[in-house]
């Protein structure tokens, strides 16, 4: 047997091992990236559901003739601001996340003020549609928490 075949065989084997290892790392990175994108999509879906419910809730509350217009306006403006902020999970920066979180916090705080001021309107509290929307909103807040937790867990992998 020729002596030069052994070193060539070893080199070819090492190249093959490195190639397979590189492909494995690339595939794992792609799977991780896709999982992060999927979880971010779930977060956005939960926030979109909340925004849709807020629109329905505001329309129901508008039916109360003497309801505080400033509270409704604050909710509508916060919702508009939150829906204008979008993030691409593959190119996310800490500044974008901070802006997104600030917009969502604005929605949460104005929505909390709305729900507190509703306590002063017994007819509105007795409105079946309003109560249903309030329950759905609470459920959606739980979905948001779950989606954000799963996203954070996936990013840490």
PLM feature spans:
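A helix-centric hydrophobic-segment signal that preferentially recognizes long
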Residues: 1-157
């Amino acid at each position: 047997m020729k002596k030069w075949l052994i070193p060539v065989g070893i080199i070819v084997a090492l190249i093959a091992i490195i190639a397979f290892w590189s492909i494995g790392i690339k595939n794992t990175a792609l799977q991780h990236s896709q999982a992060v994108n999927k979880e971010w999509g779930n977060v956005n879906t939960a926030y979109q559901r909340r925004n849709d419910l807020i629109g329905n809730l505001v329309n129901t509350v508008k039916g109360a003739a003497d309801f505080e217009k400033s509270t409704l306006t604050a909710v509508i403006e916060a919702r508009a601001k939150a829906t204008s902020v979008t993030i691409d999970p593959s190119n996310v920066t800490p500044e974008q996340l901070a802006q997104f979180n600030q917009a969502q916090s604005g929605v949460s705080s104005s929505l909390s003020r709305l729900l507190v001021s509703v306590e002063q309107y017994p007819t509105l509290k007795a409105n079946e549609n309003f109560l249903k929307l309030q329950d759905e909103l609470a459920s959606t807040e739980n979905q948001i928490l779950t989606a954000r937790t799963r996203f954070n867990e996936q990013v840490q992998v």
